[in-house]
Regions:
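Active-site core segments that coordinate phosphate-bearing ligands/cofactors
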Residues: 1-3, 10-196
Length: 196
């Protein structure tokens, strides 16, 4: 049975035992890693984000956005059925959390910013400050039209489980009479990073 193979699930803060001699040798054949190190339940960025945003009580939640994006909501009660779109995880203290994860967030936007970096380097700017570049472009987006000047972008860089595609194809389109400028270009790519 799989239950006999997997370790028992523990809550953050529980003692999970100590590293055995056999385990130390498996992890570090050189012998530098010593046995006896106390172990604790593993924690990842999702749990860390919940704690950092104080989103650990029922009916609270947080969003983590980067190359991918996910929303985590601490559930008031258990779901009545299975939803393919929702992964169930727990808070560090064991409360049930509904997590929706998307592979696409800033990857396409990052690719465009890197294109601007390459452009600057071709004009002799060797050491491009990426913080300044992102800041400049993001602030420029604030000057864009509310409708992004008629520009349209689909930030479908990677495939998504929910759509059934293993690969994505990002897309940027405009009409001949769209208000095509830097502000609208950046604004539409910021919009699509979180909304497409």
């Amino acid at each position: 049975k799989v239950e006999n193979i997997l370790p028992k699930g523990l809550i953050a803060g529980d003692k999970a035992g100590i590293l055995s001699e056999e385990g130390a040798k498996l992890l570090d054949p050189s012998g530098n890693l010593e046995a006896g190190i106390p172990l604790c339940p593993p924690e990842g960025d999702a749990g860390t984000g919940m704690v950092a945003t104080n989103s650990v009580t029922r009916k609270t939640g947080n969003v983590s956005a980067g190359t991918s994006v996910f929303a985590m909501i601490v559930l008031e009660k258990e779901l009545k059925k299975v939803y393919d779109e929702i992964d169930l995880v727990t808070t560090p203290s064991g409360d049930l959390v509904g997590m929706v994860h998307c592979n696409n967030c800033t990857s396409d936007l990052n690719a465009w910013v890197n294109l601007f970096k390459e452009f600057a380097q071709n004009f002799g700017v060797e050491d491009v400050d990426m913080d300044q570049l992102y800041g400049t472009l993001y602030n420029k987006a604030l000057e864009g039209d509310k409708d992004c000047g008629g520009l349209l972008a689909y930030n479908y860089f990677s495939g998504e489980h929910i759509t059934g595609f293993e690969e994505g194809r990002p897309l940027f389109v405009r009409k001949p009479d769209s208000n095509f400028n830097l502000a609208n270009f950046m604004r539409v790519h910021l919009y699509t990073a979180l909304g497409a």
